[in-house]
């Protein structure tokens, strides 16, 4: 191992404390990307940019002072925190991640450390505070997204090339500490800090600071969780330290992608969370979703279950409009997800990797009491769902999760079964619950081929 003095991971396996157990049980979250970028919605000076709307300042090369003049237009008159919270509740989200401050530097709370806040807009009120209360009132956990990279701050540096840069960046880190302390103090019910904008050389060169921030927040808010994206070790390694150990409480590198369900089973050894957009790459509000592929509700559900089947969480993103409302497509998506979760959520919440070999029909998940769920997305023409159990495990019974209708199970070979599809096609992805137990001896029934 690399020297014991290295600032890196404090653990290398799944944490079993109550906060991480709750994080794990939640499984489904919603992401809210909301900032000044919602006003232009991907368009600047008559030109529409197809890239991520929250990066428009960068795409269009807009000077910081000009960009921040958008604050004069920030007045989301249709914003209703209670409606937002009800939408998340109906979707089945157990937690919501909110962009307190994205790369542009605009703060949704009245920070006393910068002028670029909601307090200095026509709206004036503490948007973040309204959201925290509304979501908490619905029993939904609050997570704070926070961008360390800040395009509005004169002391931010992408890299440290001189003593002057070092001094300026030290001031910037102190500013960031103060904002984080402010958030932790103002909103003590926050359960998680999800850091972003931490990939620059300046931050990787200051790995000690990332460890300091994690410790500071955990001391201020016992039980708060921190994502791996914050951390860098003394060698500049991110997410995982130079010894290969996870930094932070859970891995957060799966953005708009997922681990392969056959090749990447190593992720089942630690906690992780993926996040996804609905268009291909739009986090903030963009006027024109026709510029890229837009996922259907079934495709979103597939990604949610995919994550859970490998022991991970999934966060589905929403980019509210500048007026504070959601586009109709996002409302419809939340409704569709919620309808399915109401029926089949038992196969998602508090579920984990089942240890069964992946099959083409969909995914397995495992409940806390050992029950195994088959979440079927692809109905086979054979009308038989192949199940291959781990060695020493047999399938005793199968039934539909939502109706308890018994499903026929036929043992076809050692540790292999055919599970029939339902007599009536559910017309949507459905769930079969398997009752499994330790297998009785079958040595005399099956023999391996001699080749």
Model-identified regions with their sequence ranges:
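Positively charged, low-complexity/disordered segments
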Residues: 1-8
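Mature catalytic domains of secreted/periplasmic carbohydrate-active enzymes
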Residues: 9-10, 14-451
């Amino acid at each position: 191992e690399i020297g014991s003095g290295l600032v890196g991971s404090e653990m290398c396996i799944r944490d079993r404390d109550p906060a991480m157990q709750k994080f794990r049980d939640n499984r489904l979250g919603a992401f809210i990307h909301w900032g000044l970028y919602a006003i232009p919605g991907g368009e600047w000076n008559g030109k529409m940019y197809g890239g991520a709307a929250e990066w428009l300042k960068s795409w269009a090369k807009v000077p910081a002072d000009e960009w921040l003049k958008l604050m004069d237009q920030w007045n989301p008159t249709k914003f209703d925190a209670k409606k937002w919270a009800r939408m998340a509740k109906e979707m089945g989200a157990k937690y919501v991640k909110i962009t307190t401050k994205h790369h542009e530097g605009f703060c949704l709370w009245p920070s006393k450390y910068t002028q670029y806040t909601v307090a200095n807009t026509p709206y004036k009120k503490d948007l973040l505070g309204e959201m925290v209360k509304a979501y908490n009132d619905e029993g939904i956990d609050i997570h704070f997204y926070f961008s360390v990279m800040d395009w509005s701050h004169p002391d931010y540096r992408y890299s440290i090339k001189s003593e002057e840069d070092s001094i300026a960046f030290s001031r910037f880190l102190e500013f960031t500490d103060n904002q984080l302390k402010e958030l932790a103090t103002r909103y003590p019910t926050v359960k998680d800090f999800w850091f972003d904008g931490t990939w620059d050389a300046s931050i990787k060169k200051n790995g000690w600071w990332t460890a300091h921030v994690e410790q500071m927040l955990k001391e201020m808010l016992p039980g708060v969780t921190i994502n791996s994206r914050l951390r860098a070790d003394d060698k500049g390694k991110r997410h995982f330290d130079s010894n290969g150990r996870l930094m932070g409480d859970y891995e957060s590198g799966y953005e708009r992608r997922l681990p392969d369900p056959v090749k990447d089973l190593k992720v089942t050894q630690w906690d992780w969370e993926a996040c996804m957009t609905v268009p291909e790459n739009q986090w903030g509000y963009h006027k024109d979703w026709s510029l890229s592929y837009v996922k259907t509700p079934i495709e979103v559900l597939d990604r949610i279950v995919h994550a859970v089947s490998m022991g991970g969480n999934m966060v589905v993103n929403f980019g509210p409009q500048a007026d504070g409302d959601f586009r109709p497509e996002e409302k419809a998506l939340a409704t569709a997800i919620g309808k399915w979760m109401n029926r089949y959520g038992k196969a998602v919440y508090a579920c984990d990797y089942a240890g069964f070999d992946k099959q083409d029909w969909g995914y397995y998940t495992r409940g806390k009491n050992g029950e195994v769920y088959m979440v079927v997305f692809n109905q086979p023409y054979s009308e038989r769902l192949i199940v291959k159990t781990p060695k020493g495990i047999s399938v005793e019974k199968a039934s539909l999760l939502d109706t308890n209708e018994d499903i026929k199970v036929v043992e076809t070979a050692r540790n292999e079964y055919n599970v029939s599809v339902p007599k009536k096609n559910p017309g949507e992805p459905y769930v079969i619950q398997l009752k499994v137990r330790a297998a009785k001896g079958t040595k005399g029934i099956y023999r391996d081929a001699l080749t």
